[in-house]
Amino acid sequence: EMYLGGQGVGEATDKLLYGEVNPSGRLAETFPLRLEDNPSYLNFPGDGVNVDYAEGIYVGYRYYDARKMPVRWAFGHGLSYTEYEYSNLNMPAESLDDKGCVKVTVDVKNTGSMVGKEVVQLYVSDKNGTAGRPVKELKGFAKVELQPGETKTVEFALTARDLSFYHEGLGDWYAPSGTYEVLIGHASDEIALRGELSFKTEKQLPLYVSGATTIGELMAHPVTAPIIGGLMQNMQGAMGAMQSDPTENVEDTLGTGAEMMKAMMHGMPLKSLASFAGAEMAAQIELMIQGMNQALGNK
């Protein structure tokens, strides 16, 4: 694929084919196996007047990664008359915050017999289960020329912005606290090295409390956590008083462990908690919802 090579494309192609020059270009798009594999296939060409661009962020490699779909040639793919080896992925600081910067270095070696240029690609993957995020995203690349047998160190810099997506409710770029994977590869489907990065943000997403809000969401917010925590303690005390044997463990009675109970409560919406707790507690929960929205500044 020579793309629009200009007036001298014929001579350039001749030099590449006969080995006078080592190719070092990379595809800036994905070549699918079939036309029907394109993410826009169902929406194009539209109704003759309007076209619905329904792919959202899932275009190119983001779409094929999410679908785990094989392709003809991947984003970032390129040919060479030599081969390259990656090693020593290093991040001196393995944690990052909103204002910090992490240096990422990797060694690249030309293991062939011809001088060449390699395009080192850095991708980032959100490992926190954040809804609506791609499997990975390109966040940096660098082209480096290497003599046969030569090794060079390539350096990247990652900031919070590289981990983030634009959050409409917040009106700002946002990345949740947690674990992110740093991937180094020859192309989007040829990942050679992986490393983990821990991120901590001070940004708080806007929260409006309703019956559909889960206990886990409330426990994760510094304003609502003390309020819901107090309610849970009151409920735990009430359940303990209802037991005929004060020494009996509620978890044993339910036949489950502490972790399973914690996971169940984490995903439980307040309206389910209200129905579980009885009429008196349901009224208390309704008042608590109003109080939490006031504390959050919601009207």
Please provide the spans of the model-predicted regions.
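Low-complexity, Pro/Ser/Thr- and charge-rich linker/hinge segments at domain boundaries
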Residues: 200-220
